[in-house]
Amino acid sequence: MALDEAPAEARPGSRAVELEIDGRSRIFDIDDPDLPKWIDEEAFRSDDYPYKKKLDREEYEETLTKLQIELVKVQFWMQATGKRVMAVFEGRDAAGKGGAIHATTANMNPRSARVVALTKPTETERGQWYFQRYVATFPTAGEFVLFDRSWYNRAGVEPVMGFCTPDQYEQFLKEAPRFEEMIANEGIHLFKFWINIGREMQLKRFHDRRHDPLKIWKLSPMDIAALSKWDDYTGKRDRMLKETHTEHGPWAVIRGNDKRRSRINVIRHMLTKLDYDGKDEAAIGEVDEKILGSGPGFLR
């Protein structure tokens, strides 16, 4: 049975870590197949999530289909007008970025809807302007590009894990708003999403990945290393939202403990902001303001 409380100690050679959560010491062993009771009980409502249970599956699927029909209309409009759209997906590890992207693109024409998920930079790329390798993937006329993580690596994982210098981090926070103003001036519609989840929910999803043979590939050594760096990531998240939430690049912040509500509201937000032909407001519905808000103040 997984250990619920400190002062119990991690087994020698194990990957168990001692965590401080809400003023209490906990032991979490990701390799133990039994999910600790305290995680299972607290995961969904963690981080003050406003709902007690998931969105009903039937309601979710019916709503998602309507929204995906609207996304097909968006593609026809983009192809007819040459409009360009980019959506950046950032968030906590295991927050559901990939799932939100898949829900968006599932029924779009792959010839003009593209996902960018860059690996670590090559030696050549490390010698270039930081933004250069991202610019190379930007959309052409009529194209919708979605980033599964983006240039905002330099605002989160890189400074937390020591992959950039403090000066590079500070320089990025100054340059990102100017970079995004250039994107807007070029006529590209830029969406930026930060998907947030509670700590217990993150632990539950990590545990699910570890013990599901179809999902274990999603769990990286970086995820394990980050288990004890929650507060560091929180500080970097808050600073990023404060410094880079601008008129040209506003952040839409999503509470992501329920993946269904998260996906629905991500798509609704984009459809609401795009002025495309044949737009069906009734099919889109209203963004849930308990789930999606704007900028750094939403999570306070």
From Swiss-Prot:
- Altering residue 223 to A: what's the impact? Loss of activity
* Substrates-to-products reaction catalysed: [phosphate](n) + ATP = [phosphate](n+1) + ADP; [phosphate](n) + GTP = [phosphate](n+1) + GDP
Look up the EC number in the record and give it.
2.7.4.-
- Reported effect, residue 149 to A: Loss of activity
Q: What is stated about pH in the biophysicochemical properties?
A: Optimum pH is 8.0-9.5.
- Looking at the keywords, is Kinase present? yes
Q: Which GO terms describe its biological process?
A: ATP biosynthetic process
Can you provide one Gene Ontology molecular function annotated for this UniProt record? polyphosphate kinase activity
Pfam families reported for this sequence: PPK2 (PF03976)
The impact of changing residue 202 to A is: Loss of activity
* The protein's assembly and partners: Homotetramer.
Quote the function comment for this protein: Uses inorganic polyphosphate (polyP) as a donor to convert ADP to ATP. Can also convert GDP to GTP, with lower efficiency. Cannot dephosphorylate ATP in the presence of polyP.
**Into which family does the record put it?**
Belongs to the polyphosphate kinase 2 (PPK2) family. Class I subfamily.
Protein name as it appears in the record? ADP-polyphosphate phosphotransferase 1
Annotated organism of origin: Rhizobium meliloti (strain 1021)
- Origin organism lineage: Bacteria, Pseudomonadati, Pseudomonadota, Alphaproteobacteria, Hyphomicrobiales
